[in-house]
Amino acid sequence: MCTSSKSLLDLIKYPILTEKTSRLIEQNQYSFAVDRKADKISIKSAVEALFDVQVVAVNTANQPLKKRRVGKFIGKKSRVKRAVVTLAPENSITFFENA
């Protein structure tokens, strides 16, 4: 598990809003960028505590490191861990309602 000193806001960085995640919202699945060291259990407890919902499942994926070029310099885009959180049918997160 992730260290207990991290707060809930440190685990969940920001919501991910794309066309695909907009379709997933209709299926009651919400996507977040999370701390790379966070595990599924801590992500579940953080979402339940922050949004007062019941989480059914958590799926995670580590995105690969991507190289980006700016002029003649080659840099690296930071890696992100995505979490797709499935909620119980009677729950929803109002933060995503306007998306």
Swiss-Prot record:
Matches recorded under InterPro entries: Nucleotide-bd_a/b_plait_sf, Ribosomal_uL23-like, Ribosomal_uL23/eL15/eS24_sf, Ribosomal_uL23_CS
Function: Binds to 23S rRNA.
Organism: Emiliania huxleyi (Coccolithophore)
Top-level lineage group: Eukaryota
Gene it is expressed from: rpl23
Localisation: Plastid, Chloroplast
Any Pfam family matching the protein: Ribosomal_L23
Keywords assigned by UniProt, alphabetized: Chloroplast, Plastid, Ribonucleoprotein, Ribosomal protein, RNA-binding, rRNA-binding
Assembly mode: Part of the 50S ribosomal subunit.
Record flagged with keyword rRNA-binding: yes
Family: Belongs to the universal ribosomal protein uL23 family.
GO molecular function terms listed in the Swiss-Prot or TrEMBL record: rRNA binding; structural constituent of ribosome
rRNA-binding found in the keyword field: yes
GO biological processes: translation
Official protein name in the record: Large ribosomal subunit protein uL23c
GO cellular component: chloroplast; ribonucleoprotein complex; ribosome
